[in-house]
Amino acid sequence: MKEVIITINGDDIADRIFSESAYAALARAKGGLPERFTDIVQATEDDRNLIERFIIESVNEAAGIISRYMSPCSATYMQTEENTGGTIYIRFAMPHNCPGSLAASLKESITSFAAAQSLQHWMLTVKTDEANIHLSKAQNDIARIRELLSSRTRPVMGTAEDENIIEL
């Protein structure tokens, strides 16, 4: 077993949520809605604490899924002064027959899932009819995470006599 630590910057996820909520507000403004209806959708720095809580919940959900496929998985959230959004560490043990690129792919999928799930929670608090769009994105990301965790590298037989020993 190989220990893997995935490090995710919480500010990156929060920035995605801020930009996507700004796009939603802009689309509403272009649709002719009054400013009071567009401002409510856009997340601001005042909403950061609530959004960080959504991010932590989403990452913990992803860690729970990893625990079903790998050894017990832990997600730790650490906030530092230079990083206002905090850093998230996800730690688990990976079998030897997992692809080497699994950790990088998992990091991207978990980051995408946390952003979509957190944005869905945000939309549920401000505009419930737009939350389903982000829910389907989060469900696709969860399916991708499960697919990544299920993948294994198959042993390859060598051509020479001494290469036909398979190590697991």
Q: What does each model-identified segment do?
A:
Residues 1-103, 137, 144-168:
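Conserved short "hinge" loops at termini or chain/domain junctions
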Residues 94-105, 120-128:
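Short acidic, glycine/Ser/Thr-rich loop/turn "cap" segments at secondary-structure junctions
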Residues 122, 126, 142, 146-149:
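Short, well-ordered alpha-helical segments in soluble proteins
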Residues 127-137:
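Short conserved catalytic/interaction loops centered on acidic-Pro-aromatic/His motifs
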